[in-house]
Amino acid sequence: MGERGELVSDLHPSDDHDADPRLAPLLAWRQQLVDSGAVAPRSFKEAHLRLVLRSGRTDVEQIRAMLPGSVAEHAEEMARILAELTPAAPEPDPPPVPEPQPEPEPGPGKHRSPETDEPPVATTTEIPIPTTGFAPFQFSSQQVALHDITVQRTDAAVELSWPPYEAPDDEAARDISVVMYRVVSSDDQAPYSPDPAHLVALTEEPKATDERQQVSPVRHYQVWVNVGASEAAARKAQPVLYATAVLVRPVTGFEIREDAGWVIGQWTAPPGVTAVHVFRVPIDEVDRDEAQYRILTAGENLAGFVDTEPVRGQRYRYRARCAVNVDGVVRLSEAAEADVELAAALMPVTDLVVETAADGASCDLSWTPPAGGQVAIYRSQNGPSAGAEAIELPQGALEQVGLTPELRVTQDLTEETGSDGRRRARLTGVTWPSEWSRAYFTPVTLMGERAMLGRTLSSVRTGTIRDIELAEYCNKQVLTFDWPDGAASVIVYLAPKGHDPRSGLNGRSFEISLEEYERYGGMHLTGQLPVGGCSLHLAPVAFAGGRRVVGAFSSIEYRGLLRLQYAVRIGRDPNGFPTTATIALRAEQNVPGSPGFVLVNNPQRLPLSVHDGHPVDVAPLDARGQLADHPSKELRWSALTTSGDGELWAANLSGLQGWIRLFVNIGSPAQLRVIALLDPPVETLRLTAATL
């Protein structure tokens, strides 16, 4: 303690340095750095400014060595301020160098005390620092340790060790018979040299023990090496920073316990610790990097934690490490740790999903596996007894609720990870007896001799839609089919021609119930189907457990229908006999070109077909109403339009009587089926004079 007392006395001399006029400007400069965010208040303290003023050092590198690492970059600016604040008093002449041989002048950045009996004129004289028999440390460039000190805390002390010293290549020729390790420590801030720090040990072995109790949150350890041909030479040599370590004080009163599936930790964090990092490590992975298992990162956890997300039935090792920011780097203490094994709880499956296949003959089941136990799926025709869900039962009581061993599904189970990162168990292609129209699936969690039923879901198997017919009328279509067994309704999707429903259906759809189907004799589609045709895909719809279940699809093609409508205006002579007829045609949609048409005359009745009478001579008219071409037996428009006023044809009715009617002149019955030619009012097709 005597040496330690001398050290404290030397570092804090009795003279009042608050009287130093340079302190106030330096404090203002420090505050500017803090306010701008360039340095942290805890990294650059007023004590550092006082230490530099007491030392009397003004060289940049000397000041840099005395500042913390995160502040060292501002040493040049501090030296400039000191130079500006130093009074411009004349310096005394340096004393003569003693003979016969002067010692070498110190290089740039070295400090040398004046060798004179008279005190220097400047007021910033160097205050000698006790060195325990070693030469005072001379500041040069900032030193960086080559090695780390291995620190091991025991119940009574801290054990320190480091690699044995090896001379660098440029000193291999020197005699370094003596290697002295000076192990020093300092709380809160790293010492800038071994002189002002607490001497832990002076040893020739690469190890030491520190028996002092740590009371500050951070303790810095340094190993400085003095080497020489003898002990005296080694003590006179300048020390070299060889190894360093930072020891963060751990938590105390560490306690861990489980409470109903949660894990609760309690401790006391030392003063000055900013946060405690908590890790939950699976017991099988305790040797892996623990950083990935850190939890509760949003809180400081200074007094403990509550972990609400451990998995029941698992065993974990919980670790707590105090965290302190040291020169911009987060340092962690050694871990306080304990193992916790959470008791497995019997939990029901509540998110069973049943997906019926497109053919309706099978289904896929999926669910989230519970934390403990295994899940068995039971398939039944009527489901388990009411009130058995989420109740713990002996496995032997499953038969009493209707779940007998032969109802258990024995297919292989697979597991997959969903897009949200959660595990899902899956059974694919599960079928049930063909005579069942409905099947109930019940998940049962089994653990030891205990069982718990989860949520039961059902799947419905509807009949296949057959005998589909689409009847075409002039202004609508009527869809008929055999109503499928077990269906509450039938849905019809429209899709392009040739579309495979297995590729997905997202177009227009229509749905009809059994009551509506029987009332109207089918599904009536008025103006709903495209003129160019489409495919219709029908599927039965049923409901199971509030879920909508769509059965297998059946399809039919609709070729489409082009609706045309013509108008006839008959011209007559003064006696009322027909002479000419003007014919106009319009389409339901614009079509380039047109098929051939024939105007047929039958003197007895309205013509029934293109062959029921005689064709009438026709010719197109130009814009002035004159014949634009020679007469022919066939009409053919250049384009069919929705307006019908773009092109007119004229017919020669001289000497004709009875009736006329326009027909599509196409030989292919298949093509005829996609064109509907609508007649005008019958009276407009009659040639007989109105007076007759």
From Swiss-Prot:
Residues 1-23, 87-134 are annotated as: Disordered. Disruption phenotype: Loss of DNA conjugation when disrupted in recipient strain (MKD8), no effect when disrupted in donor strain (mc(2)155). The recipient strain does not secrete EsxB. Residues 1-21 have a biased composition (Basic and acidic residues). Coiled coil: none annotated. Residues 89-107 have a biased composition (Pro residues). Disulfide bonds: none annotated. DNA conjugation in M.smegmatis is unidirectional with distinct donor and recipient strains; mc(2)155 is a donor strain while MKD8 is a recipient strain. Mutations in a donor strain that alter DNA transfer do not always alter DNA transfer in a recipient strain. May be involved in assembly of the ESX-1 / type VII specialized secretion system (T7SS), which exports several proteins including EsxA and EsxB. Involved in DNA conjugation in recipient (MKD8) but not donor (mc(2)155) strain. This is Putative ESX-1 scaffolding and assembly protein SaeA. It comes from Mycolicibacterium smegmatis (strain MKD8) (Mycobacterium smegmatis). The gene is saeA.
